[in-house]
Structures are given as structure tokens and as C-alpha cells.
Amino acid sequence: MDTLYKGPALTAELLEKRIREFNWELHAVAQWREPDPKARWHVLVKDNICVDGLRATAGSKAFKALKNDKDAFCVQKMRSKGIHPFGKTTMSELAGFLSTTMPMGYSELGAQGINPIDPDLTPGGSSSGSSISVAAGFCDAAVSTETHGSIVIPAMACGVVGMKPTVGLISRTGVVPISHSLDTPGATARTVNDAARLLSLLAGPDVDDPYTDHCPADLDLTTDLGLSKTPIRVALLVPQDGFDPEQKTALENLIARCKTVNIKIVEAPLKTVETHYKRISSTEIQGDMDKFLSQWGNGQTPSSFKELVQFYRMRDQHHPYGINRLEGALEYDPDLTNNDYLSALIEGTENCRLAIKDTLYTATADAIIAVGFVPWWAVGQAPYIALPIGQRQNKEMIGITIGARQWEDRKVLDIAARIEAILNRD
């Protein structure tokens, strides 16, 4: 068997066989139970999301003993609709908030995640284990999370689909936090339709997460997905230095195929935008982590963000890439009424939303395509989805993201499904 899975629908027996045979070298599944042979869909959950009876470590020794007898709200939603997760996926330690030099997909607990396409390629991060698991046939889909590219980057690296929804579509209650303004669970899957199905299972209002107040109680993002033949325009963001030859070839194929199904792709400039991501996340993680640990900690973990930093300082010999990102957060005032923080939050989110709005308006477009990661949707709290469009000679995948405005999740999925369908034609 190949580590990269391209076969038919997975059975419990087959995925269990694949996990046992390949997980030791891919380091994608952190914990798992025997999957239910009667289940029609098999889902894993990123290891920063609380699941009853399983640890929620975020890849960190500090949280090795963090085990709850309750589910995160989004997991409760999924269970209420008959889907029960059977395990946890590995991830970049603390969702990448440990060090700026740490490789994507690495954690002390989970080791280095390996891309099933080629071990020399990055798996991306921080939802590395989710994308590796989907690509390797360890599950049908995986619940992942994103603050700043953590769903779409590994999805593009591993050649799968990954959607980060509008912040507020899915509750963050019971998820190890970085930023309440930007964090969200999302979906990693083999197809756009599977991603839409998982998002529909996870979505819904939660009284403990005010960002979800505008989310419908019973959201269905799958009905008639990708079946529309209505002509649409999509803006392609072009960097100042353009695209390399292999990207150009993949894009030319994409543009030509899209023309056959009434999707016109027009070029638009990729603008440089000040997001203030570092200040926003460094400020918010301090109070957000304090709150999470007070509600979900169990006495065997640090009880505050400062204690978490101290835990790492006392074990610096175990962290070959340092802890500069984690320590650096302490340089920022955690007070959410601080004017510098408020100005950065307002300016950063508005800059990104305006970049999306202006691009759509100027190009008279319905959505926007970017090659690789562009932070507009992460900091603008808006939806975008990653899918593969080609592959380089060195086997590295060429991926795009498709994004739109806040709460246009259905539109993003529909356009992605139409594009996916034409790319899959012979």
C-alpha cells in the first residue's frame, strides 16, 4: 500500500489497517480508538479540540495530562448528528505559537509530521496531522483549526481540501485558544462536498461563544453544491513579481477549463496589507489561555498563560527551536481595553476586509482566487477554501484558495465545487 491514498471509500477495517501500517512514519494520528465498523463516515479531530475521554494536548508536554470528560461544543454538535470522532490528529506545537523557527508540523509530543506525497516536502501547519490523515486515508475527514493559515496551508501542501469558515460559523468553546478574534474550527477533507458536510455538522450558535450569535441553528451547506451553471467572475490575485513557470502552467489549465463552465477568471493586483496579526494574537492569547485553563484545565496543567511560559522556560533543553514566539507575547499588554491593541485589531481586520471588498468591486467579481496563502481571510474573519490545481516536477503541490466576504461560506463552497469538478475531468 502507498502512504498517499487514492482508493475508494474507506471502511473502518481499511483505515485501521492504514493507520497501523503507516502512522509510525507519517506521525499524523496522536490518539485513536478502534473505529466503529457500522459508521458510514470516519472523522478525526485536531489535538487542540477537547473530546470526551481523549487528551487535548496541542502537541505540548504542558497539556499532556489535559483530559476531559466533556466535548468541545463543535464536537457535541457533530455527535448530535450521529458522527462520533474516533481519534485525534497531530499538529504544530501550540498551533505554531511556540517558535518562529520551528518547522511546520513539528511538536514535542507528535514528532515531525511527514507529507505522504513525499517525505522531503513540508506537510504545512498547524493542522498538519489533519491534512496528512486525509491524504493518507486514515479518515474520511478531519476537524482542523485556523488562526492564521493553519487549515489552508497544510491542505495545499498535502493536496487535499481545507476550508476555514467565517469566524462565528463554528463555536470555539473547548478549543485550546490563540485569538478569540481569529480562531475557528474548520474542515479538512478529500472533496469540497465532504468539507461542506463536515462544516454543516459542526456549525451552530453557542451561548458561550458570542461570535456564533448570527449562525443558523441547522445549517446545511451541501444541498445542490456545485450544480449551478450561472456565469460567474473570479478575480485572480497576481503578485508584483508574477508567477513562476509551473504556477503559470497550472493556472493556464485552470483558466481554460473554467471558461468551459461559465467561470471567467480575471486578473487583479495582490495588495500588501497591514494585518497587525502579531499584536492581535500576542495580546489575546494571554487572556484567552487563562480563561480556557480555568474552565478546561484539570489541575495537572499550567493554570495560566504565564505558567505555561514558565513551564517551557524550565524545559528549554527539550525545545530545539526555542520559544521566542511564546515568550514574545509577554511583551504585549494583555489588557483588551489597551488603545494600541484596539487600534491594531480594528485596523487589521478592516484592512483585510477592505482588500477583499475593493478587489471584488474593482474586478466586478463574485470571489477571489489566490495562489498560496494570503492573510486577508484569516485576519478579515472571512471564509476561504484551499484545493489543489497542479503539481511541480519535485512533487510539491500547487494549491489555490478561493475566498469571499464574511458569511459567504456557501458561495465559496459552491464555486470551489464547480472548479473541483472541472479539474477532475479527464
Identify the function of each model-found stretch.
Residues 28-31, 164-252, 425-426:
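A short helix-breaking turn/cap at a secondary-structure junction
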Residues 72, 79-202, 382-390, 396-399:
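Short glycine/serine-rich loop segments
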Residues 1-67, 72, 91-96, 214:
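Short, well-ordered alpha-helical
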Residues 15, 195, 234, 258, ...:
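Residue-level signal for inorganic ion chemistry
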Residues 40-61, 231-233, 283-350, 388, ...:
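Short helix-loop capping/hinge segments that flank enzyme active sites or metal/cofactor-binding pockets
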Residues 46, 80, 84, 139, ...:
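Glycine-rich, small-residue loops and helix-cap segments
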Residues 11, 243-269, 290-312, 345-362:
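Acyltransferase
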Residues 1-31, 53, 252-262, 310, ...:
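An N-terminal boundary/leader segment
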